[in-house]
From Swiss-Prot:
Family designation: Belongs to the EF-Ts family.
CDD domains referenced in this protein's UniProt entry, alphabetically: UBA_EF-Ts
GO molecular function: translation elongation factor activity
Gene that produces this protein: tsf
Species of origin: Chlorobaculum parvum (strain DSM 263 / NCIMB 8327)
Protein name (Swiss-Prot/TrEMBL): Elongation factor Ts
Subcellular location: Cytoplasm
Short name of any one Pfam family annotated for the protein: EF_TS
Keywords: Cytoplasm, Elongation factor, Protein biosynthesis
Residue ranges, annotated region (Involved in Mg(2+) ion dislocation from EF-Tu): 82-85
Length: 288
């Protein structure tokens, strides 16, 4: 067995976050091979290397900012490595600054924002360079993961940020009565955040995704011993249930388990003599 040095043990600990004794044992078990030691620890469920990679993508904040007239809104995800930094004033202040900059400059994508110059407080650097400077300031890598902008010229925007700023949703609703529709739009934003739909309506769900689900359900039915002549009917039943899970208008309404979102919209329109149509939504969850 090769001699295991304290330096090697420390290097493995720095890489994985695992305790010194476990690192020493891993190196002994793998003949001092660093890579094999990491794999050994992962297999034992003790390694933190994979978790650290996830933390880079999952810690940070979702930030949403809307114009005063609620016609334009931006949602972005800014990542860091630890929750400690994510909750700090330096990080949250920077995230809010980026959202304000994106809204003011009509940025519709991450790339748009990266090319914009920040103010004097951040050295008049472009956002892309400021991210690197901020990394040095907070001691962790910062990354602008994604950004989207929604507009509702003929309606209203609403948003929802879950406590902790790890989950947020922005929704655009077309309506001829925007003031009356604001509360409903807020509920719909909460619906998007909580229920995680992928599209507004059934027709927008990608055909290839539907076909993939159908094939999975078909194979499941056959594996359950269902007769071939009944399989198609079973598949369609399960596809309809799938739509109820991923299509916003077909989901169960979070504030009334006996109602569908489509029914809530219909009731609102009748009661308020209004036209309401969900135009688009964006949902960001840290690391997702």
């Amino acid at each position: 067995m090769s001699q295991i040095s304290a330096k090697d043990v420390k290097e493995l600990r720095d890489t994985t976050g695992v305790g010194m004794m476990e690192c020493k044992k891993a190196l002994e078990e793998t003949g001092g091979d660093m890579q094999k030691a990491v794999e050994y620890l992962r297999k034992k469920g003790a390694a933190m290397a994979a978790k650290r990679a996830d933390r880079e993508a999952s810690e940070g904040a979702v930030c949403i900012l809307m114009s005063d007239d609620q016609k334009t809104g931006v949602i972005l995800e800014l990542n860091c490595e630890t929750d400690f930094v994510a909750r700090g004033e330096v990080f949250t202040g920077f995230a809010n600054e980026l959202a304000e900059l994106a809204l003011a400059n009509n940025c519709e994508s991450r790339e748009d924002l990266l090319a914009i110059n920040l103010g004097e407080a951040y050295g008049n650097e472009k956002v892309e360079d400021a991210l690197k400077s901020m990394t040095g300031k907070v001691g962790e890598k910062l990354e602008l993961k994604r950004l989207a902008m929604l507009k509702a010229e003929d309606g209203v925007l609403e948003s929802y940020i879950h406590p902790g700023s790890q989950l947020g949703a922005l929704i655009a609703v077309e309506t001829d009565k925007p003031e009356e529709t604001k509360a409903l739009a807020k509920d719909l934003a909460m619906q998007v955040a909580a229920a995680s739909p992928i599209e507004v309506g059934r027709d927008a769900v990608p055909a290839e995704l539907v076909e993939k689900e159908k094939e999975i359900y078909r194979q499941q039915a056959l594996a359950e011993g269902k007769k071939e002549e009944f399989v198609d009917k079973i598949v369609m039943g399960r596809i309809n249930k799938y739509y109820q899970e991923v299509v916003l208008t077909e989901q169960t309404f979070i504030k009334d388990q006996n109602a569908r979102v489509s029914g809530v919209l219909d009731d609102f329109m009748k009661k308020n003599q209004a036209q309401v149509k969900i135009k688009a939504f964006v949902r960001y969850q840290l690391g997702a």
